Amino acid sequence: MSKGFNRFILVCLGLVLAFMYVPILAIIGMSFNGTPYGMFPYVFTTRWYETLFTTSNLPAAAWLSLKFSLAVAAAALVVGTLTAFGLQYWSPRWARRFNALMQLPIIIPWLVTSISILLLATFVGAGRSYLTMFLGNLIVVLPYVVLLVNARFAEMDHAPEAAARLLGASPARVFWDVTLPAVLPGVMAGGIMALIVCFNNFVLQYYLSPVEVNTLPVTVFTRIKSGYQADLNALSAIIVLAAVLLVVLLSRLGYSAGDLFGGSTGGKERKGE
């Protein structure tokens, strides 16, 4: 390829990266700006972080969202992993049909899903409740776990499982000592996706949560309607930092994005090559 074409590709790559990360960096910078409404001149301050942890209602909402998302992700991990494991004993024809069915909650707009679940919950007498919100979010995040873990099952070598059975290991021992470690990257990826999707899912939480319950997405939506909120920038910066720390932690453990969301070998195996 010519040098001009290479430069064009690099420029396009730079524009894409700028489009992705400049807004995030801008929010972090604005979280330290003491000028009203985040305008110029830029005056460095940490008072928005002080406001966040003293008088703001955002930390309580964030903590509620985190606890709720962890509970939903944990349930999705257990149900999704066992479902993907059970699919290995289905015929390929029915397994493909089930996988196609599991994609529907991802494809169908969350607004439609929320209204449908709310109508059903109202019909059975549950209404807007923690249980309704929990089941609604579980329905949406469960396909991510099933599909990611099932993809890892499809790529794994089943010879160690057969060898363990020949040596007299029980089915439970084979699953815990052989199967689960082999699909662990897929399980981790499914858990991360379930946590992120549930934590950010404003639509489901807005329509299904009890009236007095305000998760972080609902709280942010309510407050942003009244105008610029500087402590929102501070909370956003902390969430970005937490995401970066998670990526660094996974990298230190030997897992990359390719290991978790694709590829035929896990990070631990790559490090030993």
Per-region residue spans from a language model:
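Transmembrane alpha-helices
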Residues: C12, L17-I24, L104, S114, ...
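Membrane-interfacial helix termini and adjacent extracytoplasmic/periplasmic loops
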Residues: Y37, T46, W94, L111-V140, ...
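Hydrophobic positions within alpha-helical transmembrane segments of bacterial inner-membrane proteins
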Residues: V22-I24, S69-F85, L111, I115, ...
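N-terminal, non-cleaved signal-anchor transmembrane helix
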Residues: M1-S56, A60-W63, K67, G254-E273
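Short hydrophobic faces within alpha-helices
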Residues: A62, L87, L104, A159-L167, ...
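C-terminal transmembrane helix and the adjacent membrane-cytosol boundary/short C-terminal tail
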Residues: S2-V11, W94, N150-E161, R165, ...
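Interhelical loop and adjacent transmembrane-helix boundary motif
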Residues: S2-K3, T35, Y49-L58, F199-L249, ...
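Transmembrane-helix boundary motif in ABC transporter permease subunits
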Residues: M1-N6, L70-M102, L119, F175, ...
